[in-house]
C-alpha cells in the first residue's frame, strides 16, 4: 500500500485538476450561451433560405441553373465542420465515424470522394487516414466570420461548376440541446427539393428582377454560404455544450476519486498508527 504522504500528494493533485475542469466547465457554459444566441439569430435566415431554394427546385424556371440539375455521380465532395480544440467528449469522433461510413458507401459504388475541412481536428484526422483533402481552414475562434469560410466554399463550388464534383454535402453537428448534439450530413448541391408535403403538391412560378440568371447566380451562392455558416455556428454551440458536459463529468469523477483516495489514506494512517503502538508496547515489554 502507498504511504500516507504519497496519497496526500495524489489527493492534492486531483484537487488541483478538479479546480481546472470546474473552471473550464464554467467558461464553456458562458460561451455556449453566447453561441446559442448567435445560432438562434442566424437559423431563421438559413431555414428560410432553404425553403426558398426548395421552392425553386420544384418550380418551372425560365432559366435552369446548373445547381438544380441532377448528374451521374462520379465524385462527391464534403464540406466538413469540426472543432479546433479538443476536450469535447465524442463530438468530433462521432461525426468522423458517420462521414467515413457515408464515404465507404459511395466508394463501394465506384464513386470518388474529396474533402474541404474546417477545424484543426478534422484536418489532423483526415490527413492521418489518407483521405483526399482539397482545402482546409483552421483557427476560426469563438466568433467565426463568413469571410474566413469563403476559401473552402469557393474551392468546392468551383469544382462543382467545372464538373469535377457531382454532389456536395455539408457535414456538421446539429445542436439539439445541451445534452444532445447530432452528427448530420446534408446535401447542398444539387439543390434538394422541399421536403414539406404541401409544397410538393403545388406548382411554383416566379417573376424575376432584373433577370433570372443574375438573380439565381447570386441567390444560389448565398444559399450555399448560409448553409455552411449555419453549420459552423451550430457546430460551435455543440462544441461548447459537449465541452461543458465533459468537464462536469471530469469534475464529478475527480470528486469520486478524492473520496476513494481519502479512504485509502485513512487506512494507511490507521495501519501506521497501529504499527507504532505495537512497537511501543513491544519495547515496553522488553524492558
Curated annotation (Swiss-Prot):
TM regions (residue ranges): none
UniProt-listed GO biological process terms: proton motive force-driven plasma membrane ATP synthesis
Keyword Lipoprotein recorded: no
Keywords: ATP synthesis, Cell inner membrane, Cell membrane, CF(1), Hydrogen ion transport, Ion transport, Membrane, Transport
One Pfam family cited in the UniProt record for this chain: ATP-synt
GO MF, one annotated term: ATP binding
Coarse class of the protein's main subcellular location: membrane
Family as reported in the entry's similarity comment: Belongs to the ATPase gamma chain family.
Descriptive protein name: ATP synthase gamma chain
Native source organism of the sequence: Sodalis glossinidius (strain morsitans)
Amino acid at each position: 500500500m502507498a504511504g500516507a504522504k504519497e496519497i496526500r500528494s495524489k489527493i492534492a493533485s486531483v484537487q488541483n485538476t478538479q479546480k481546472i475542469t470546474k473552471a473550464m466547465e464554467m467558461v464553456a457554459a458562458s460561451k455556449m450561451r453566447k453561441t446559442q444566441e448567435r445560432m438562434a439569430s442566424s437559423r431563421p435566415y438559413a431555414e428560410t433560405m432553404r425553403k426558398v431554394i426548395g421552392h425553386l427546385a420544384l418550380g418551372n424556371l425560365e432559366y435552369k441553373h446548373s445547381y438544380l440539375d441532377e448528374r451521374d455521380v462520379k465524385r462527391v465532395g464534403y464540406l466538413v465542420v469540426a472543432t479546433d480544440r479538443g476536450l469535447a467528449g465524442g463530438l468530433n469522433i462521432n461525426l468522423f465515424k458517420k462521414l467515413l461510413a457515408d464515404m465507404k458507401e459511395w466508394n463501394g459504388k465506384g464513386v470518388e470522394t474529396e474533402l474541404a475541412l474546417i477545424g484543426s481536428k478534422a484536418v489532423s484526422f483526415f490527413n492521418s487516414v489518407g483521405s483526399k483533402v482539397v482545402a482546409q481552414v483552421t483557427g476560426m475562434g469563438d466568433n467565426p466570420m463568413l469571410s474566413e469560410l469563403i476559401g473552402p466554399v469557393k474551392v468546392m463550388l468551383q469544382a462543382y461548376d467545372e464538373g469535377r464534383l457531382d454532389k456536395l454535402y455539408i457535414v456538421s453537428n446539429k445542436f439539439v440541446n445541451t445534452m444532445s448534439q447530432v452528427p448530420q450530413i446534408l446535401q447542398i448541391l444539387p439543390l434538394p427539393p422541399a421536403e414539406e408535403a404541401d409544397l410538393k403538391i403545388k406548382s411554383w412560378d416566379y417573376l424575376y428582377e432584373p433577370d433570372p440568371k443574375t438573380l439565381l447566380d447570386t441567390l444560389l451562392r448565398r444559399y450555399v454560404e448560409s448553409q455552411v455558416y449555419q453549420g459552423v455556428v451550430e457546430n460551435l454551440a455543440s462544441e461548447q455544450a459537449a465541452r461543458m458536459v465533459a468537464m462536469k463529468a471530469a469534475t464529478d469523477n475527480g470528486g469520486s476519486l478524492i473520496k476513494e483516495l481519502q479512504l485509502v489514506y485513512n487506512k494507511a494512517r490507521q495501519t501506521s498508527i497501529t504499527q507504532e503502538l505495537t512497537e511501543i508496547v513491544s519495547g515496553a515489554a522488553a524492558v
